Amino acid sequence: MINKVVANAEEALKGIEDGMTIMMGGFGLCGIPENSISALIKKGTKNLTCISNNAGVDDFGLGLLLQTKQIKKMISSYVGENAEFERQMLSGELEVDLIPQGTLATRCMMAGYGIPFFPTPAGVGTEVANGKQMINWKGRDYLIEEAFEADFAIVKAWKGDTAGNLIFRSTARNFNQPMSMGGKITIAEVEELLPAGSLQPDQIHTPGIYVHRIFQGHNYEKRIEQRTVRKK
């Protein structure tokens, strides 16, 4: 069984160059590959296209890469919690492609399945449909959406083994799982790295065949996106 372990985030990110397209896992502020984002900032790679459900917040997640102006284009679904994202988008500094959330996840999965495109009714009759091919099937219109082509996918898992098998935890599974299948090279950072064979096969969410590099992450934060307390 192939050992896919690398020493750290810096080693895992080798080969990422200016102008590449990267899938970045996470949902809200959970399941974010924090170590890899920090390493990308130090690496200084720029003009990136990032595919992610959201853009983090101003001082966490992809918001950190927006602060350093390393992202050229965001392909996302929900971006409403990041003031710096809004500023860059409205000023024309940042290209933005907003995609329905289900379509975003499916375009990631289709890349992993090797399926080049798929039909969906989501977005028909809206700006999402502009410039896209449409078909009519049994009296209903569908958009033709293409699978993503990402140079790298970077995800964070709860547990992983040295062969690259991954288990995600609760909501953090949301986009990490489909993205872990969709990159030409997939990098996984994990909270707990175990020997191959330690994970129960029926609990594995992403088989190691999709994962190329894995490393033990450290110092993860447990951020709260919006703190709400009861009023007395």
Predicted regions and their residues:
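Conserved alpha/beta enzyme-core scaffold
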Residues: 1-232
